[in-house]
Amino acid sequence: MCGIVGAIAGRDVVPVLIEGLKRLEYRGYDSSGIAVLESGSIRRVRRTGRVAEMAVAATQEGFTASLGIGHTRWATHGGVTEANAHPHVSHGVVLVHNGIIENHEVQRERLSALGYVFQSQTDTEVIAHLIHYHMQQGDDLLGALQCAVKALTGIYALAVMSEAEPERFVCARMGCPLLIGIGDGEHLVASDISAVIQATRQVIFLEDGDTAEIRRDGISIFNAEQCPVERPLHLSNVSLSSLELGEFRHFMQKEIHEQPRVLADTMEAAIDAAGFPPMLFGAQAESVFRGITGIQILACGTSYYAGLTARYWIEAIAGLPCHVEIASEYRYRKAYVNPQHLVVTISQSGETLDTLEALKYAKALGHRHTLSICNAPDSAIPRISELICYTRAGPEIGVASTKAFTTQLVVLFQLAVALGVLRGAVDAEHEAAYLEQLRQLPCGVQQALNLEPQIAAWAECFASRHHALFLGRGLHYPIALEGALKLKEISYIHAEAYPAGELKHGPLALVDADMPVVVIAPNDSLLEKVKSNMQEVRARGGELFVFADQDSHFSESEGLHVIRTLRHTGVLSPLVHTIPVQLLAYHTALVRGTDVDKPRNLAKSVTVE
């Protein structure tokens, strides 16, 4: 959600800024801009729409400079207009900002009384004027930034330049990700590693309260008390190839097809250990796991559906009660506290604000034990968690999550079995059986991917519909939820999901010949119940699209379409059945001509409320 990039070098940084912003497009945005210091003066270009349009304007205007900053904006305060796009300028001070300033109205009134004139509706312009005000009082750029942020309430990542100090720029972080890229005689800042990987693999992650001065010959970092500090240097393992499309039409399609490999990578430690030791979740995990009496899962969106799936595994395999809650709801209610419950947070980015704040709230309430499941090392959520387990999905560029979801499921399954083994609920024979199911999973997922041509044919039918209903039972109900979410996210077709047994309690009223009904029907203990629910749909003239196992014994007929996956894959069946619903959403969006990787109104990393 929004993106920042800045650079200072002995070369023209405009191509670096443009390429960095293109790498940040996946986060979601509606406008973009860059500002450079050229011959001591600020030059700025902003556009609504795609980064490519802004880049053309910058080229036509002959932008070239050794110092500059850029931004992709996802509108929060103020509409999608060029005036509201970043960078924002105040009397020779120019900045870009991610986050939300909660007290911007108070500051706006104060600054207006001092004679400042506002050109936009944004909260960001307040910060530019505040910094200029403090420079007028005698502070240098860094000091003015440090004074300004003390007056702000909210979250922010900032990069700031001034015509008065053309040999450096400064930045600040509070609640929003920001990193510094360390190059050879050049330095960069960005909200995401993908924006700097073109120039360097060496990065420093700023912490909340940090400010920094960035020069060609070095950097200086200061903590919230304005004392100089050292932050650790990290070598990123992100590759440029992982950020490129290769042979695929969209990143979402690429990421769907990467799942056999990333699932194998994520389960590698368990396979190498020939079991499910607590060590998979950190050195302290065994002592923590032995003392817990329940699990509380907090997550948002797709990660929440991963948590719902995990509840079935944790309760059935480990014999522990498991509660799953949407993070944005949990943090605003007086929640029940049991210090012996393990709080598990799930976030692809590790920066999801509602999940981060829910974790802080849980800790403040008295929850002592926390585990984060995340795809981004050194992000905010893992930094404040007691235990950490990283998925190994690699960069996920498509806004609609695919491989991050299935790798989360693998980690959650490993958690359920590890707890079960430790508690004596899983014996050696069953542990070996679970491990074998895990080994076979990448092959099962690949077989599901081989169904793509059949699923693409279904998409031709779905593309002309306005609504869809997804049904599942037990372990596969959360997969129905995920299928409905994917379809609505990228094809803009209204889709809902229900437990199949709930049809007669309301949703059946919606069923007619124009409502396609997707059913996830593996050959498990609930199959006959699902078949009965399907008959309820057929009796009302509904058209059924069924994802079934090879041995589920469905026969196609008018109004009943069936695609068969491989034979039933036990408790890991939800992962295999995830692939078809991802492909159905993708190909339906393709037929409808929507922007698959950047669906309207959505952002990849939701770092605001």
Swiss-Prot record:
Catalytic activity of the protein: D-fructose 6-phosphate + L-glutamine = D-glucosamine 6-phosphate + L-glutamate
Its job: Catalyzes the first step in hexosamine metabolism, converting fructose-6P into glucosamine-6P using glutamine as a nitrogen source.
Keyword Secreted set for record: no
Primary localization: cytoplasm
Entry-linked CDD domains: GFAT (cd00714), SIS_GlmS_GlmD_1 (cd05008), SIS_GlmS_GlmD_2 (cd05009)
Gene Ontology MF terms in the entry: carbohydrate derivative binding; glutamine-fructose-6-phosphate transaminase (isomerizing) activity
Protein's name according to its UniProt entry: Glutamine--fructose-6-phosphate aminotransferase [isomerizing]
UniProt keyword list: Aminotransferase, Cytoplasm, Glutamine amidotransferase, Repeat, Transferase
Annotated active site: 2 (nucleophile), 604 (for fru-6p isomerization activity)
UniProt cross-references to HAMAP family, sorted A to Z: GlmS (MF_00164)
E.C. designation(s): 2.6.1.16
Residue intervals of the Glutamine amidotransferase type-2 domain: 2-217
Enzyme class: transferase
Subunit structure: Homodimer.
NCBIfam families: glmS, PRK00331.1
Gene Ontology biological-process annotations: carbohydrate metabolic process; fructose 6-phosphate metabolic process; protein N-linked glycosylation; UDP-N-acetylglucosamine metabolic process
Cellular localisation: Cytoplasm
Domain SIS: 285-425, 458-599
Taxonomic lineage: Bacteria, Pseudomonadati, Pseudomonadota, Gammaproteobacteria, Lysobacterales
Residues forming coiled coils: none
GO annotation, cellular component aspect: cytosol
Domain of life: Bacteria
